[in-house]
Amino acid sequence: MNIVSNKLISVLHAEKPASDRADKLRLYGRFIGDWETKIIAHAPDGGRHEGSGEIRFGWILEGRAIQDVWMIPQLAERPNAPPFPVAGNWFGTTIRIYDPTIDAWRI
């Protein structure tokens, strides 16, 4: 990993939720950690395809937000896994930020 990437990770990652909003962060904070998932995709012809994936949730931005990263297939199965039917092999991410000024989540 290069120096720029290490710097990005060090400012993005947080060890715990921000104390001034920890109670509100519990809504999604309960998912913090690594999860294995079963993916089911339905093809236009009615076919059903199943595969494995993983989701990683973590605190970011001084504990004021939660980020997840979805991976299909699981990281350990890459790069030799054939494309998952219908959806293909992919990464995705979501950032969830609790906004205390409106008492709501921005996703």
Give residue spans per PLM region.
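Periodic aromatic/glycine/histidine/acidic cluster detector
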Residues: 25, 67-69, 80-81
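Amphipathic/hydrophobic helical signal segments and adjacent flexible N-terminal regions
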Residues: 1-48, 56, 60
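Short glycine/proline-enriched turns and hinge-like loops at secondary-structure junctions
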Residues: 47-50, 87-89
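Hydrophobic/aromatic beta-strand elements that line small-molecule binding cavities or substrate pockets
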Residues: 52-59, 70, 92-97
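Short active-site-proximal "capping" loops at secondary-structure junctions
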Residues: 42, 62, 73-76
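A generic structural motif
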Residues: 38-42, 71, 98
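Short, hydrophobic/aromatic-rich segments at coil-to-beta transitions
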Residues: 32-36, 62-69, 102-106
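Helix-adjacent hinge/juxtasegments
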Residues: 72-107
